[in-house]
Amino acid sequence: MKWLLLLGLVALSECIMYKVPLIRKKSLRRTLSERGLLKDFLKKHNLNPARKYFPQWEAPTLVDEQPLENYLDMEYFGTIGIGTPAQDFTVVFDTGSSNLWVPSVYCSSLACTNHNRFNPEDSSTYQSTSETVSITYGTGSMTGILGYDTVQVGGISDTNQIFGLSETEPGSFLYYAPFDGILGLAYPSISSSGATPVFDNIWNQGLVSQDLFSVYLSADDKSGSVVIFGGIDSSYYTGSLNWVPVTVEGYWQITVDSITMNGETIACAEGCQAIVDTGTSLLTGPTSPIANIQSDIGASENSDGDMVVSCSAISSLPDIVFTINGVQYPVPPSAYILQSEGSCISGFQGMNVPTESGELWILGDVFIRQYFTVFDRANNQVGLAPVA
């Protein structure tokens, strides 16, 4: 009987998962549009989502060319605490980057004044460093310092975690951003300044039983989405998980066999690379095939630069199918057409990223809302299954 009890306790310990609920909020793009500021923003900022991927690292100056404008369309956010006692921050859980940073009290930029700011003097566990960090984007850069403190993430106390404290955040548009900072969940190889990413630090301290995390993004307007650290909850998906090898341990990069519509190949005819990225809201790919897709679904550009379709046409549009590791993953029009306040916007965006392996696609939230996703660091693979 004692052995049975012990085995039961061991099994229970292996099933412990830490869940961080994600709240779906109005995107920065939508807020700017409602305030009549979007056109001016788009004029001043040359939006190029490609800058987020494969940046040119400059180690001596610790420069990371990761444009914050990439988060213009983000809608899913979670809360973390930093310090003792914890100071709360709303962050993007981003599998397309690796650093953690939040605004600090040292930041007097307009963008910082409307957000929570970390105060090191209010934390008994904060440790300062002499290191600085700069994230370059658009017309300026976010500059700051690096420090160490305890980070509370979904019930996990991640001690001695390095993170960035911003001192300047250019661009008044960030004043309206629905998030305070970014929590990166990609591999440490792309971390600016060599900072240990949050999940790596959590795993290294033995705080989770499995070296993986998983993501469920609900289509619900406000709640239901979650990041699960250290486990997989099968109630979020149907069928079984299909596993796809990571091809490059930097981003969560995988191979796509082909992309088809109505049974015909429309892109990626000889295979291509794709990054599974919770920090990108849309499905992005090379401008030429994306332009063809936009044409095929009847999308045209409006005055805000969005590609829109007739809402009445959605029911007649075809699925777009991504074949990955031999398994088909259809994305229906109800997923790739985003409906907002009477407008129906295409969830596809053109982006050219030169890579040694050819064209690159980004499977953002439009895709992840359809497929429960497991990011398995232990086996360097991504698991996908239809959401429940």
UniProtKB/Swiss-Prot annotation:
Leader sequence residues: 1-15
Chief localisation class:
secreted
InterPro entries on file:
Aspartic_peptidase_A1, Aspartic_peptidase_AS, Aspartic_peptidase_N, Pepsin_A, PEPTIDASE_A1, Peptidase_aspartic_dom_sf
Q: Which PROSITE patterns match?
A: ASP_PROTEASE (PS00141), PEPTIDASE_A1 (PS51767)
The record places the active site at 94, 277
The catalytic activity, as recorded, is: Preferential cleavage: hydrophobic, preferably aromatic, residues in P1 and P1' positions. Cleaves 1-Phe-|-Val-2, 4-Gln-|-His-5, 13-Glu-|-Ala-14, 14-Ala-|-Leu-15, 15-Leu-|-Tyr-16, 16-Tyr-|-Leu-17, 23-Gly-|-Phe-24, 24-Phe-|-Phe-25 and 25-Phe-|-Tyr-26 bonds in the B chain of insulin
**E.C. number, please?**
3.4.23.1
SUPFAM superfamilies, per database record? Acid proteases
Return the protein name.
Pepsin A-5
What organism does this protein naturally occur in? Homo sapiens
Q: What is the lineage of its organism?
A: Eukaryota, Metazoa, Chordata, Craniata, Vertebrata
